[in-house]
From Swiss-Prot:
Keywords from the UniProt entry: ATP-binding, Host cytoplasm, Hydrolase, Magnesium, Metal-binding, Nucleotide-binding, RNA-binding
Gene Ontology MF term list: ATP binding; metal ion binding; nucleoside diphosphate kinase activity; ribonucleoside triphosphate phosphatase activity; RNA binding
Subcellular location: Host cytoplasm
Gene3D superfamilies on file: Rotavirus NSP2 fragment, C-terminal domain, Rotavirus NSP2 fragment, N-terminal domain
Record-level GO BP terms: viral genome replication
InterPro entries: Rota_NS35_C, Rota_NS35_N, Rotavirus_NSP2, Rotavirus_NSP2_C, Rotavirus_NSP2_N
Name under which the protein is recorded: Non-structural protein 2
The species this protein was found in: Rotavirus A (strain RVA/Cow/United States/NCDV-Lincoln/1969/G6P6[1])
Family, per entry: Belongs to the rotavirus NSP2 family.
Length: 317
């Protein structure tokens, strides 16, 4: 995760802003600079290579002292920064909005995946600039649209029906901020269209999840799509979701947290996110992840007859 201010800076032109991507040498200057505390939140002028991000975001970049940041010296950093600028420059951002826009925390890996989709000649985003920019504006939280299958970050499609598409995420192969744990495996489910979904299509998805992904929890980050994650990683997801939710509220970026379909979401996660929305502390919310929940009455009794036992997946074992 990183703020938009880690990728670009605003340049006032008439009554709105044009956004310009940072270059890696300017960032490198900022990372070595001694800056007064009072100037930590201001864009840094490298003198030689142009404007750099505010020094308060130093930890967002990979250095000798911090291996968890972005690999900003890779070509992918520039591609992501340029893509963000293209999207922001396609809309009007005024002086009253610019601080709020740049403070938004975004998924770096999501943006890298959109770059990969853009470069894939077989992908609809390669052929449609309008759809590409819509996808980016959704990814950076500047659109009220939810991420649907056409505007999704992408990955490897492992399941699809008339209503849903399930993707295997490819973060292990990333350049900008790769997942280093070689045991990482995670999926994302997007709706094909933002409209009511028939019970039969929900039933098909739940059957697939129950039999092929029975070692995983179905959760949501509140953005209109589902994530299918290992139970061992649920607590980590909870920390991130809670931190992003609080950060957005603090910065005035109040975005409705979409709890999604309770029949699909893991019961404990639904309790966690509901508690978070009510304003409870992280400690109180996380306790709900580890409590034994009273089983809801199964809205889809008989699902077990939809698959034979020899079809049960070993994924995640």
């Amino acid at each position: 995760m990183a703020e938009l201010a880690c990728f670009c800076y605003p340049h006032l032109e008439n009554d709105s802003y044009r956004f310009i991507p940072f270059n890696s040498l300017a960032i490198k200057c900022m990372l070595t600079a001694k800056v007064d505390k009072k100037d930590q939140d201001k864009f840094y002028n490298s003198i030689i290579y142009g404007i750099a991000p505010p020094p308060q975001f130093k930890k967002r970049y990979n250095t000798n002292d911090n291996s968890r940041g972005m690999n900003y010296e890779t070509p992918m950093f520039n591609k992501v920064a340029v893509l963000i600028c293209e999207a922001l420059n396609s809309i009007k951002v005024t002086q009253s909005d610019v601080a709020s826009v740049l403070s938004k925390v975004i998924s770096v890996r999501h943006l890298e995946n959109l770059v990969l989709r853009r470069e894939n000649h077989q992908d609809v985003l390669f052929h449609s600039k309008e759809l590409l920019l819509r996808s980016v504006l959704i990814a950076i939280g500047h659109s009220k649209e939810i991420e649907t299958t056409a505007t999704a970050e992408g990955g490897e499609v492992v399941f699809q029906n008339a209503a849903f598409t399930m993707w295997k995420l490819t973060y292990l192969e990333h350049r900008l901020m790769p997942i280093l744990d070689q045991n990482f495996i995670e999926y994302k489910i997007t709706v094909n269209e933002d409209k009511p979904i028939s019970e039969s299509h929900v039933r098909e998805l739940i059957a697939e999840l129950r039999w092929q992904y029975n070692k995983f929890a179905v959760i949501t980050h509140g953005k209109g799509h589902y994530r299918v994650v290992k139970y061992s990683s649920v607590a980590n997801h909870a920390d991130r979701v809670y931190a992003t939710f609080k950060s957005n509220n603090k910065n005035g970026n109040v975005i409705e947290f979409n709890l999604l379909d309770q029949r699909i979401i893991w019961q404990n996660w639904y309790a966690f996110t509901s508690s978070m929305k009510q304003g409870n502390t992280l400690e109180i919310c996380k306790k709900l992840l580890f409590q034994k929940m009273k089983r809801e009455s199964n809205p889809f009794k008989g699902l077990s007859t939809d698959r034979k036992m020899d079809e049960v997946s070993q994924i995640g074992i």
